[in-house]
Amino acid sequence: MRRRRAEIRKVPPDPIYNDVLVSKLINRVMWDGKKSIAQKIVYKAMEILAEKTKKAPLEALHQAIENVRPIVEVRPRRVGGATYQVPIEVQEPRKTSLALRWIVEAARAKKGRPMAEKLGEELVNAFNNTGTAIKKKEDVHRMAEANRAFAHFRW
């Protein structure tokens, strides 16, 4: 066990849009430490997003991520030999990281096109409240709703 709680590291803003959220998306897309490739992918995806939504790329990205952010999730909790799925509210930083993770996973799951196109399309879908990432959020909310009876087990 840790002696004290781990410090939350500050993510520096990205060089082009000067935004922390874009930086986090780049880090989420990055594989094997290849940041320059991840940056190209994300910036190309942002261009696609701006083109399709007719909005400023940063504004559109923030809206897309806001649409995917979950409000509640379920966590397993053991009570007397049984494991219950207990719905709990999601903390602010986790909302954003889950949204980014779901968007990138949804883009990676698509096959047969460059990652920038897939990510751009997934961001457009998230902006329009459709797509795989939004479906994932709705599934998580549905699970929480189905297990509402166990909400009193919260800790």
Swiss-Prot record:
It comes from the Bacteria. InterPro entries: Ribosomal_uS7, Ribosomal_uS7_bac/org-type, Ribosomal_uS7_CS, Ribosomal_uS7_dom, Ribosomal_uS7_dom_sf. SUPFAM superfamilies: Ribosomal protein S7. The keyword Ribonucleoprotein applies. One of its GO terms (cellular component) is small ribosomal subunit. The keyword Magnesium does not apply. GO terms for biological process: translation. Keywords: Ribonucleoprotein, Ribosomal protein, RNA-binding, rRNA-binding, tRNA-binding. Pfam families: Ribosomal_S7. GO terms for molecular function: rRNA binding; structural constituent of ribosome; tRNA binding. One of the primary rRNA binding proteins, it binds directly to 16S rRNA where it nucleates assembly of the head domain of the 30S subunit. Is located at the subunit interface close to the decoding center, probably blocks exit of the E-site tRNA. Part of the 30S ribosomal subunit. Contacts proteins S9 and S11. PANTHER family: RIBOSOMAL PROTEIN S7 (PTHR11205). Belongs to the universal ribosomal protein uS7 family. This is Small ribosomal subunit protein uS7. It comes from Thermosipho melanesiensis (strain DSM 12029 / CIP 104789 / BI429).
